[in-house]
């Protein structure tokens, strides 16, 4: 279950930038997201969106329950107001210096550098309007509704203690939530002065003045967004309550970056608790740290990094991307995306280990020795050597299952690759080749039969990670998918079964492509900064030399009694400035800004 979170200031801001309506923008990006996930072979029962009728109905119903149960309070506050645009500026329309870390481009609701979300737009230093950076916001009073998280804290804390323990949350998810609770929860505004969003249900207000105040306000995106999981389910099935109103029989697993944790571990659960209704609540929270790019940070605005829509353009199959990204999933610490490493892991791991193991065995069975028919491997199947080999495979399988049950996805992938290595070691230790088949046919048949069944098991355990690879293995084996067993027998593909023809699972990536891709997708930030600084320095030196030359020429002309003029582009020089000043005014125009 997934979808696009479409309401909020970010949407309004982007729509303004692109010159379209918020609805047009959301339609565009919902399709882009859906197409990317389809290409990556990420499957959902439904990939939905939050700008729907169901979202409005469910969000407003939760709000009414909170209102009735006295968990909401109205507060007047001072908010930034743009006199030029005649409107209050929502958090994301304000940018400035983060009060926590000093980052100069922090938003009014969140700092992308340090991750802080526990400050307001008025806390920013050197605040400016995002729409028009030359405008400095003024402060005016506005009224908003807040959820009383302080009153809900004891219940949130009790729920969190139980859920995080039973659900074995990721450590960073627990630490972030504990930090919020330790500081003490405060009431938090859940309405905003925006147009694009879920409207406030005015029927809860008895006073006409209140209705007038709130008729042009909408819900804060992070009160509204988490309800999207529920509304998207409701878009999928009319029986959505069987999933979301059955806490005893349904377990909710959620996956996210660490900066979104508080909204899912505090605000949304608090909203659910406050309705006094039975809700399916978060069971397991799987959170990640940050994936960085070439020793720097990904940045869409600066074009640094390869993003989902770029991956397809490289011509590299989705499974290679899935393997690398899952192997580098930042589960416990930040990780790096590096092109050299990306290429190396395709060539030395996917191709050299998994690909070659599968190809070697299937080609052997395709050969004249077996004519694509699985030999009778039963004669020596119970031999202690082979029993021990199957035991080792089962040990790797057990570790894999344990990792997957704990949602340790990176470890699960490594466990699967360890099983492949065990398979490779198995056939190498027995020197499986034409000579063994000729001299010891029973032993060769047993090694081949066990190896074929290891490959069959690989198709199953790699399916969550490499679906296209899994499908190709099964097609080559001409065998059905094997549900991942708790214990592997090594006998699922029987003697006499005819397999298909061998195909390569992976291809070599030319290491020379590293430079091409690094240049195409921005390279390292350090290199980009170095180039920008060098260009700026060169431009400044050139401008200074030009200014010096103009000054020298001006003096010479002055000595000759000739009126000196200087030009700046196609414009005449300022008559109130000396010639040198007129020329140096152009320096800023050619200076490249560092970033």
Q: Model-flagged regions — what are they?
A:
Residues 40-42, 245-248, 292, 300-304, ...:
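Short acidic (Asp/Glu) and glycine-rich catalytic loops that position anionic groups and cofactors
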Residues 1-159, 165, 545:
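N-terminal, positively charged nucleic-acid-binding surface of large information/translation enzymes
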Residues 330-349, 357, 364-412:
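Long, amphipathic alpha-helical stalk/connector segments used for oligomerization, subunit docking
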Residues 24-35, 61, 353-360, 395, ...:
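A non-catalytic, amphipathic alpha-helix used as a structural packing/dimerization or gating element
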Residues 75-80, 84-85, 96-115, 119, ...:
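Basic, alpha-helical terminal appendages of large translation-related enzymes
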């Amino acid at each position: 279950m997934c979808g696009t979170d479409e309401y909020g200031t970010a949407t309004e801001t982007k729509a303004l930038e692109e010159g379209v309506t918020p609805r047009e923008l959301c339609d565009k990006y919902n399709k882009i997201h859906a197409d990317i996930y389809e290409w990556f072979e990420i499957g959902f029962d439904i990939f939905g969106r939050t700008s729907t009728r169901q979202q409005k109905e469910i969000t407003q119903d939760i709000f009414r329950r909170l209102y009735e149960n006295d968990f909401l309070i109205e507060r007047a506050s001072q908010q930034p107001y743009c006199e030029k645009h005649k409107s209050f500026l929502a958090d994301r329309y304000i940018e400035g210096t983060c009060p926590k870390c000093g980052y100069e481009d922090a938003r009014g609701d969140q700092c992308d550098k340090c991750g802080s979300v526990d400050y307001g737009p008025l806390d920013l230093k050197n605040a400016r309007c995002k729409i028009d950076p030359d405008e400095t916001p003024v402060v005016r009073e506005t009224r908003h509704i807040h959820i009383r998280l302080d009153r809900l804290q004891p219940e949130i804390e009790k729920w969190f203690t139980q859920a995080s323990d039973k659900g074995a949350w990721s450590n960073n998810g627990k630490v972030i939530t504990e930090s919020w609770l330790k500081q003490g929860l405060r009431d938090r505004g859940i309405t905003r002065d925006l147009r694009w969003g879920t409207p406030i249900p005015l029927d809860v207000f008895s006073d006409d003045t209140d209705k007038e105040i709130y008729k042009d306000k909408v819900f804060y995106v992070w009160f509204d967004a988490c309800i999207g999981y529920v509304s998207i389910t409701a878009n999928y099935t009319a029986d959505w309550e069987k999933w979301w109103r059955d806490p005893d029989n349904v377990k909710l697993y959620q996956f996210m970056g660490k900066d979104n944790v508080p909204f899912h571990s505090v605000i949304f659960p608090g909203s659910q608790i406050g309705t006094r209704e039975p809700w399916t609540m978060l069971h397991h929270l799987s959170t990640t740290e940050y994936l960085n790019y070439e020793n720097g940070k990904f940045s869409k605005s600066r074009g640094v990094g390869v993003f989902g829509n770029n991956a397809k353009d490289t011509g590299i199959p989705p499974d290679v991307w899935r393997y690398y990204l899952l192997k580098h999933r930042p589960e416990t610490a930040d990780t790096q995306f590096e092109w050299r490493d990306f290429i190396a892991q395709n060539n030395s791991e996917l191709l050299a280990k998994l690909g070659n193991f599968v190809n070697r065995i299937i080609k052997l069975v395709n050969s004249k020795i077996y004519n694509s028919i699985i030999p009778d491997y039963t004669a020596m199947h119970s031999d202690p050597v082979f029993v021990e080999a199957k035991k080792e495979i089962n040990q790797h399988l057990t570790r894999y299952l344990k990792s997957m049950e704990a949602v340790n996805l990176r470890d699960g992938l490594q466990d699967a690759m360890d099983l492949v290595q065990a398979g490779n070691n198995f056939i190498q230790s027995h020197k499986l080749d034409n000579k063994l088949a000729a001299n010891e046919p029973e032993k060769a048949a047993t090694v081949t039969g066990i190896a074929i069944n290891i490959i069959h098991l690989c198709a199953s355990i790699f399916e969550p990670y490499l679906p296209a690879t899994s499908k190709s293995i099964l097609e080559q084996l001409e065998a059905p998918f094997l549900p991942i067993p708790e214990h592997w027998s090594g006998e699922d593909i029987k003697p006499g079964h005819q397999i298909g023809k061998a195909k390569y699972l992976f291809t070599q990536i030319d290491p020379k492509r590293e430079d091409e891709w690094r240049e195409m997708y921005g390279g390292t930030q350090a290199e980009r900064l170095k180039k920008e600084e060098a260009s700026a320095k060169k431009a400044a030196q050139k401008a200074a030399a030009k200014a010096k030359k103009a000054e020298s020429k001006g003096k010479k002309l002055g000595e000759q009694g000739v009126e000196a003029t200087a030009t700046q582009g196609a414009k005449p020089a300022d008559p109130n400035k000396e010639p040198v000043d007129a020329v140096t005014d152009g320096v800023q125009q050619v200076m490249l800004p560092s970033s």
